[in-house]
A protein has these predicted regions:
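Extended redox/cofactor-interaction regions of prokaryotic respiratory oxidoreductases
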Residues: 1-6, 90-198, 208-221, 226, ...
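Long, well-ordered, tryptophan-enriched scaffold segments
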Residues: 1-65
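Flexible, glycine/charged-enriched surface loops at secondary-structure junctions
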Residues: 17-22, 69, 100-107, 259-269
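A glycine-rich phosphate-binding loop feature that marks nucleotide/adenosyl-phosphate handling sites
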Residues: 25-27, 62, 105-116, 264-281, ...
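Flexible glycine/proline-enriched surface loops and loop-helix/loop-strand junctions
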Residues: 39-41, 71-76, 227-236
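Conserved short loop/turn motifs at secondary-structure junctions
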Residues: 46-50, 73-80, 164-168
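Catalytic, metal-anchored helix/loop core of enzyme active sites in primary metabolism
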Residues: 201
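Long, contiguous, secondary-structure-rich segments that constitute the structural scaffold
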Residues: 232-290, 365-379, 383-480
Length: 480
């Protein structure tokens, strides 16, 4: 956040705040200017590790380029200030004239080629406080950071987990486990077992990607070459595996929430897919009949972005929404900065993504669980390792306010000073049906992540799974 704020501030300083796209499409620009001016490059350099000279060089290279695209990814939105980071990333694209431009950032077309503006909010009342979700999506993403709290308070008494493993993916594993055990019923629907499934009252086996027909909806409006494709099932489901739609259809009927006439097993859910496809004058039947069941969509010019994507009545981009003020994001940002200054000498743990582990999906793949990847090493650069008198392969204790764990040191100068890293997804030791994963589980780094109402980001309700202050200590004896 502070690096992006400094970069935006420097670019505005160099350009004299002259931004043609802002003049045409922007509003509340002065509030953006005020926010970034509080975090100039020289001020934040010791927190970001990026000098004012480097920020200036990056700014000048962006301004000199014919075009530039800006991208943030998963680790940023999990670091406690994802909303502001993504906002500043979009503002960077806007003020440099790279939004809606070839070579810059734009939105490809899709078979549903449009956006729905926010229409009010849905409020969910809980024992902890009220959660507000923008419509039309509504409460589709309840925050995992307070799952244990909601279970302990009695707000959640039954839980159905679909293709997930909250025991590992949510912070404070021990507390999450105790909470899940208090549920009246826990059901897991998945294609293979997991630690969470082991705790479940029922494990329901679902079909895999070869056993079901499909139209990929998720990539819509995210493809550089936009297309839509229908794929038939390749093989019949084995054993007692069932399609997810069938499982929920059956549950709804047995709970008397719908009648068999409303939700019969001859309805495979494709009428809902057809409703999406109809926006592009497409249908599942049409896709079945074309070669390869694939239709390429006509791509529009990137400059069509503003006409297609601005759905506010005034057709303007709010450069600094009032909601950021009212939700306390800016006050929180200042508090985070003060915390970073106070913890300047403390190490920060970030989550690592490698080809050997992705979201826990590769826990049971033998060839990916060899050597140091059989465990979940703590990566640290040699400067920090020397300060702590650590050597390659040494076992250390890593502690945060939320918990502690043991990890094996792996020295890597790919990391900057002040930062250590561990992979997300390890720790399936309790999944007894996964031979490799249970024998070589590695350690779950999310044990160090905080939970509870104060740990999640306002607006997004995102958990803080990265940028966690930690201390590392040598193990003198195993009694330590």
């Amino acid at each position: 956040v502070y690096f992006l704020a400094a970069l935006v501030d420097r670019i505005l300083e160099v350009t004299g705040r002259q931004c043609s796209l802002v003049e045409i499409y922007g509003k509340n620009f002065d509030h953006l200017v005020k926010f970034v001016s509080d975090f100039p490059a020289q001020k934040v350099a010791h927190v970001t590790g990026v000098s004012a000279g480097q920020v200036n060089q990056i700014a000048m290279e962006i301004l000199a380029a014919d075009s530039a695209a800006f991208h943030l990814s998963t680790g940023v939105n999990q670091s406690g200030q994802g909303v502001l980071a993504y906002w500043l990333n979009e503002m960077l694209s806007l003020i440099t004239g790279n939004l809606g431009k070839k070579g810059g950032n734009y939105k490809p077309v899709g078979f549903v080629d449009g956006f729905t503006s926010t229409q009010g909010v849905t409020t969910v009342e809980t024992s902890l406080g009220n959660l507000r979700f923008p419509n039309p999506m509504g409460p589709m993403s309840m925050p995992g950071a307070i799952l244990a709290d909601l279970i302990e308070a009695g707000d959640i008494r039954a839980l159905i987990v679909v293709s997930g493993n909250p025991l590992l993916s949510i912070g404070d594993e021990n507390r999450t486990k105790l909470a899940l055990e208090k549920l009246d019923i826990l059901v897991s629907v998945d294609i293979f077992p997991s630690c969470t499934a082991e705790l479940s009252d029922y494990m329901l086996p679902a079909t895999d990607f070869l056993e079901r027909a499909d139209v990929a909806l998720l990539p819509n409006m995210m493809q550089s070459v936009p297309y839509v494709q229908f794929t038939e099932a390749i093989v019949e489901p084995k054993y007692e595996r069932r399609h997810i739609w069938w499982i929920f259809s059956e549950l709804l009927q047995r709970l008397s929430l719908v009648s068999s006439d409303e939700n019969n097993h001859n309805d495979n859910g494709f009428h809902l897919v057809d409703a999406f496809l109809a926006a592009g004058n497409l249908s599942v039947e049409l896709l079945r009949d074309v070669p390869d069941s694939l239709i390429l969509l006509h791509q529009l010019e990137p400059e069509s972005f503003f006409e297609r994507c601005l759905v506010h009545p005034d057709k303007r981009i709010d450069c600094c929404p009032d909601l950021f003020f009212s939700s306390g994001l800016f006050v929180r940002c200042e508090e985070f900065y003060n915390e970073l200054e106070a913890l300047f000498d403390q190490l920060m743990l970030i989550t690592l993504r490698t080809p050997f582990m992705h979201n826990g999906w590769m826990n049971n793949v033998d060839k990916f669980r060899r050597g140091k990847h059989a465990n979940n090493p703590l990566y640290i650069n040699d400067f920090e390792a020397e300060k702590l008198d650590l050597v390659e392969g040494e076992t250390v204790r890593v502690s945060s306010d939320a918990g502690s764990l043991y990890a094996i040191v792996s020295i890597s100068n790919d990391l900057r000073p002040g930062v250590v890293a561990m992979s997300h997804g390890y720790g399936q030791g309790a999944a007894s049906q996964l031979r490799v994963a249970s024998q070589r589980p590695g350690v779950n780094s999310n044990r160090l992540a905080p939970t509870g109402w104060d740990s999640m980001e306002p607006l997004s309700y995102m958990s803080r799974l990265s940028a966690i202050p930690v201390t590392i200590s040598k193990i003198l004896t195993w009694e330590d």
